[in-house]
């Protein structure tokens, strides 16, 4: 009987997985991610958020930053393919 009562409580790993699965999905575009990230930074810098929201905002910001960096890296790779293996510097006309 003791075995069944201990199996009813979720393990820390299961609780962690449940927390991460409830995270909002990543934005559909770089621009949407950047806009959300800018809003988060403004909220964090305001100093008006409670501590738990600061942590949540920081974690979401880290996700968005990784998303934006990955998108930029993918575009850079595509540009390299279009221009050969060497990325040429952009010159504004």
Curated annotation (Swiss-Prot):
InterPro entries: Exonuc_VII_S, Exonuc_VII_ssu_sf. One of its GO terms (biological process) is DNA catabolic process. It is found in: Cytoplasm. It is an enzyme of class 3 (hydrolase). Residues 1-23 have a biased composition (Low complexity). Gene3D superfamilies: Exonuclease VII, small subunit (1.10.287.1040). It catalyses: Exonucleolytic cleavage in either 5'- to 3'- or 3'- to 5'-direction to yield nucleoside 5'-phosphates. Its EC number is 3.1.11.6. SUPFAM superfamilies: XseB-like (SSF116842). Residues 1-26 are annotated as: Disordered. One of its GO terms (molecular function) is exodeoxyribonuclease VII activity. It holds the Pfam family Exonuc_VII_S. Keywords: Cytoplasm, Exonuclease, Hydrolase, Nuclease. It comes from the Bacteria. One of its GO terms (cellular component) is cytosol. Belongs to the XseB family. Heterooligomer composed of large and small subunits. Bidirectionally degrades single-stranded DNA into large acid-insoluble oligonucleotides, which are then degraded further into small acid-soluble oligonucleotides. This is Exodeoxyribonuclease 7 small subunit. It comes from Polaromonas sp. (strain JS666 / ATCC BAA-500).
């Amino acid at each position: 009987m003791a075995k069944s009562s201990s199996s009813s409580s979720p393990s820390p790993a299961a609780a962690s997985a449940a927390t991460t699965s409830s995270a909002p999905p990543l934005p559909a575009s770089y621009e949407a991610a950047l806009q959300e990230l800018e809003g988060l930074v403004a909220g964090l810098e305001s100093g008006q958020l409670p501590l738990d929201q600061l942590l949540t905002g920081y974690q979401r910001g880290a996700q968005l930053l990784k998303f934006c960096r990955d998108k930029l890296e993918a575009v850079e790779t595509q540009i390299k393919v279009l221009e050969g293996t060497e990325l040429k510097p952009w010159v504004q006309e």
